[in-house]
Amino acid sequence: MEKPSSGANHVAKATVSLSIASVLILGAVLTMLSIQLDEAHERLQNRMGSFKFVARNIWHDIVLVKSNGRIKRQYGGYGSDSAQSDNQQCTSCVQLRCPPGPIGPPGVSGEPGMDGANGRPGKPGLDGLDVPLDPEPAFPCVICPAGPPGTRGPQGEVGRPGQTGESGHPGLPGRPGKPGRVGDAGPQGEPGEQGEPGIKGPPGDDSIGGTGIKGPPGPPGPRGPKGPPGSNGLPSQNSGPPGPIGEMGPPGPPGPRGEPGPPGPFGPPGDSGEPGGHCPSSCGVQEIVAPSVSELDTNDEPEKPARGGYSGGGYGKK
């Protein structure tokens, strides 16, 4: 227990010794500075006296020159001025109008002066008056009107694609088309039945004997029956030309419902809306009772409102 106390004593003694030494050194430095300042002040006073003496002699010389006189200057120290004071009297003084010299450089800033004494304390003021606070008036319940609509809010995310809708009702029959162009001539028909023999005509003229000219070919006869199929042809490596395009068949039945497509990309964010207004009121919270979004069944067909009002699943205010 004695070791810590002895160490603290040594530290305290060293601190006191350093403090005393610092005070002594500071006192010695201040004394030396004061002596040096006194010596500098004395030298400055001596130089100022010499300067005034030289300036006075120069002034006397200027006065003598202006008065057409001249005197021999004698610089014999401070005592020579009294010996020549009678000869240097100005008999006809002339007022000199010398131009002012240039402005000298600014002097060294002086030391700040001592702080002034504190002013007299002011008179005490009047006592304040107690102002009773009026109780807040009980305002009636006022429902503030809705504020102006804000600006358009940010663009929401792209919703999921809806389900495929049911097929629509069959459309109305179309208008009759325009008459087409005249078709090509059809094939020649079959010869008609043989007619009854006619009345015997009058006898003809006598013919000249000989061989007559061959007459024109008669009309083609009727189409004969289908012949038997011929023998198979020789195999060929080249395929024949494509056949003609057949007529379009009737439309087929509707196909099965396809799978829902992938979700679309997110849309760009919209403009920020204006901040909504605020109406402080102590009438409770105005609530809107409506079914939750999670409770709505998007798969079922929405009910059609009854005639003269809304369906039972509408909105209501509380």
UniProtKB/Swiss-Prot annotation:
Where is the region Triple-helical region? Answer: 101-130, 147-206, 209-235, 240-278
Cross-referenced InterPro entries? Col_cuticle_N (IPR002486), Collagen (IPR008160)
Give one Pfam hit by family name: Collagen
Changing G101R has the effect of: In dpy7(SC27)
Alphabetically, the GO molecular function entries are: structural constituent of collagen and cuticulin-based cuticle
- Alphabetized UniProt keyword annotations: Collagen, Cuticle, Disulfide bond, Repeat, Signal
List where Gly residues composition bias occurs: 309-318
The annotated regions of Pro residues compositional bias extend over: 216-228, 250-268
Record has Repeat as a keyword: yes
Partners and quaternary state?
Answer: Collagen polypeptide chains are complexed within the cuticle by disulfide bonds and other types of covalent cross-links.
Entry function: Nematode cuticles are composed largely of collagen-like proteins. The cuticle functions both as an exoskeleton and as a barrier to protect the worm from its environment. Mutations in dpy-7 affects the body shape.
Spell out the family assignment given in the record's similarity comment: Belongs to the cuticular collagen family.
Name of the protein this chain belongs to: Cuticle collagen dpy-7
Q: Please report the organism this UniProt entry assigns to the protein.
A: Caenorhabditis elegans
